[in-house]
């Protein structure tokens, strides 16, 4: 039996026009994350790291405990979903990073979050 933690991450992003102010170089994006435990042992998300890059190449790093104030436990076959946001000075950018996790055997491991786009639908980069 393979007890290696297996966690999948999916992200969908959207531009929030009602909270944005392009004339002030303020572009607000929401992103919805689904974290699925496809392994055979329970896991807990204990920390996060994000690298946010705007359309001019300016990078911002964000790290901290948990996500949206929680450190969720995810049972085998289970999932955890949350929504958060980012504010950029450009109408396009990217995010990527990782989650720091711990499994039921108290082993720490990292789950990579592949790069995803933050963009107004009318902008192509």
Curated annotation (Swiss-Prot):
Picking any one GO biological process from the record gives: error-free translesion synthesis
Q: What single Pfam family name could you report for this chain, choosing any that match?
A: DUF525
Gene3D superfamilies assigned: ApaG domain
Organism, scientific name: Erwinia tasmaniensis (strain DSM 17950 / CFBP 7177 / CIP 109463 / NCPPB 4357 / Et1/99)
> Could you identify this protein by its name?
Protein ApaG
Record-linked InterPro entries:
ApaG_domain (IPR007474), ApaG_sf (IPR036767), Uncharacterised_ApaG (IPR023065)
ApaG domain spans which residues? 1-125
């Amino acid at each position: 039996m393979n007890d290696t933690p297996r966690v999948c991450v999916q992200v969908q992003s959207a531009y929030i026009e009602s909270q944005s102010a392009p004339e002030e170089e303020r572009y607000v994006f929401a992103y919805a994350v689904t974290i699925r435990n496809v392994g055979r042992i329970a896991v807990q998300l204990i920390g996060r790291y994000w690298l946010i890059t705007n359309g001019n190449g300016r990078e911002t790093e964000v790290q901290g405990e948990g996500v949206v104030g929680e450190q969720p436990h995810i049972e085998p076959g289970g999932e955890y979903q949350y929504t958060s946001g980012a504010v950029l000075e450009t109408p396009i950018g990217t995010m990527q990073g990782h989650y720091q996790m711990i499994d039921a055997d108290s082993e720490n491991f990292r789950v990579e979050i592949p790069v995803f786009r933050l963009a107004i639908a009318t902008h192509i980069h």
